[in-house]
Swiss-Prot record:
Enzyme Commission number, as recorded: 4.1.99.23
Lineage of source species: Bacteria, Pseudomonadati, Thermodesulfobacteriota, Desulfuromonadia, Desulfuromonadales
Disulfide links within the chain: none
UniProt keyword terms in alphabetical order: 4Fe-4S, Cobalamin biosynthesis, Iron, Iron-sulfur, Lyase, Metal-binding, S-adenosyl-L-methionine, Zinc
Similarity comment: family membership: Belongs to the ThiC family. 5-hydroxybenzimidazole synthase subfamily.
Protein name (database record): 5-hydroxybenzimidazole synthase
Single GO cellular component term: cytosol
Biological process annotations from GO: cobalamin biosynthetic process; thiamine biosynthetic process
Provenance organism: Desulfuromonas acetoxidans (strain DSM 684 / 11070)
Ranges that cross the membrane: none
The keyword Lyase belongs to this UniProt entry's keyword annotation: yes
């Protein structure tokens, strides 16, 4: 069976491409061309029917939500509820990142619960299984890792974050720079580095990259090149280890595309705002515009409990400069496993961020909704305001909880409503458009 990339190269517009074109108000031929060039991906699986979601050049910036058990908290029903909440709140994709309990069970229950494209990190289960079976993650048998990747593809996952870019050379760059304020912050990345050091061997996901691609290509699953050496502190942003891994991932993205597999490149998690534009420019240049999946980024390290806000600020910048998929951050980041309220808050914050970013990335079409909202506010058209709101239910709920005496106003200003005063003063003189 051919992949989306192979169909696109052959000039065929698939059902998935046509759906994305309709949803994005773009031509099917544009989507086909970008998929063929590796600049748009549509996470998919030949064993399942996830909702077609386009990620990449010229498209709305998408939001990913991550859920999953931990070794301390295992509640399968709660993770299914979180997955459904993420979908209801407007997430475009979902990652199931469990490391506690029966990992096959939670993955399959989440896949059955939502219509979104679902991804994961195969290394999590591989190292968990090795620990249970052999007493140490460092005793992982690479053959069991490849078997697991295939099993998870068979279950219906649409994309996988796989840490192929960590190799002996990148680890040496980290060691020789003699600092890392935030240390290593990727669970999969840290475990793979430990395995490599303990066994004095190369990363099998890098060494046998063609084998990884062959498995995912068999199911038309999108390969997201994970960043196990990403910066976990803003003072580590763009250090040599992170950049070396990015270089390798961009090289692998090109190789994977040439083999007929859909490829994403993952970006960093902590980054000061003044470095965001440069980071995206570097990734786009080195990867020939492969879709970029940014993990936030968190733009300051000192607001635990409010990292969803810090991340939203960074995500707006990322979307504006060309990031294609943003992984949400919740208020629980750095503190605890997110609960259901945290998941909703994280999705909402990321949606606001990507909307703001897209307003500036696509100014011609991205600001028309805001113009319509401004007119509705000026004219005190409340139903129209709710219709245009990004999250209308929340807006309506707030207003209904504090209704004013006069229907046209709100309880913020009451009888001193500036919009109503403006309407009275100018009586239609402000109804025109800019020249």
């Amino acid at each position: 069976m051919k992949t989306q990339v192979e169909h696109a190269v052959d000039g065929i517009i698939t059902e998935q491409m046509a759906t994305v074109a309709h949803d994005e108000d773009l031509s099917p031929e544009y989507i086909r061309t970008m998929v063929a060039e590796g600049k748009i991906v549509i996470p998919n699986n030949s064993n399942s029917t996830p909702k077609p979601v386009g990620i990449g050049k010229g498209l709305r910036t998408k939001v990913n939500a991550s859920i999953g058990t931990s070794s301390d908290i295992v509640n399968y029903q709660a993770e299914v509820r979180k997955a459904r909440i993420a979908e209801q709140a407007g997430a475009d994709t979902l990652m199931e990142l469990s490391v506690g309990g029966n990992l096959d069970r939670v993955r399959r229950e989440v896949l059955a619960a939502v219509n979104l494209p679902v991804g994961n990190v195969p290394l999590y289960q591989a190292f968990c299984d090795a620990t249970r079976k052999y007493g140490s993650a460092d005793k992982l048998d690479p053959e069991e890792l490849f078997d697991l990747i295939e099993q998870q593809c068979e279950d219906g996952l649409a994309f996988m974050a796989i840490h192929c870019g960590i190799n002996r050379y990148t680890i040496e760059r980290l060691r020789k720079q003699h600092y890392r304020y935030g240390g290593l912050v990727s669970k999969g990345g840290t475990s793979m580095v430990s395995w490599m050091e303990h066994n004095n061997r190369e990363n099998p996901l890098y060494e046998q990259f063609d084998r990884v691609v062959a498995i995912l290509k068999k199911y038309d699953v999108c390969l997201s090149l994970g960043n196990g050496l990403r910066a976990g502190a803003i003072h580590d942003s763009h250090d040599r280890a992170q950049m070396q891994e990015l270089i390798i991932n961009c090289e692998l993205a090109q190789l994977g595309r040439e083999m007929g597999c859909q490829m994403l490149v993952e970006g960093p998690g902590h980054m000061p705002l003044d470095e965001v534009e440069a980071n995206i420019l570097i990734q786009k240049r080195m990867s020939n515009e492969a879709p970029y999946y940014m993990l936030g980024p968190i733009s300051t390290d000192v607001v635990p409990g409010f990292d969803h806000i810090s991340s939203a600020i960074g995500a707006a910048q990322s979307a504006r400069y060309g990031a294609d998929l943003i992984c949400y951050i919740t208020p629980a980041e750095h503190l605890a496993l997110p609960n259901e309220d945290d998941v909703r808050s994280g999705v909402e914050a990321a949606r606001v961020a990507t909307y703001i970013g897209d307003m500036n990335k696509y100014p011609d079409k991205g600001r028309q909704r805001d113009k319509a909202m401004s007119k509705a506010r000026r004219d005190l058209q409340w139903d129209k305001q709710f219709e245009l709101a990004l999250m209308p239910e929340q807006a309506r709920q707030v207003r209904d909880s504090r209704l004013p005496e006069e229907e046209h106003s709100c309880t913020m200003c009451g009888n001193f409503c500036a919009a109503n005063g403006s309407k009275t003063l100018f009586d239609g003189d402000l109804q025109g458009d800019k020249c």
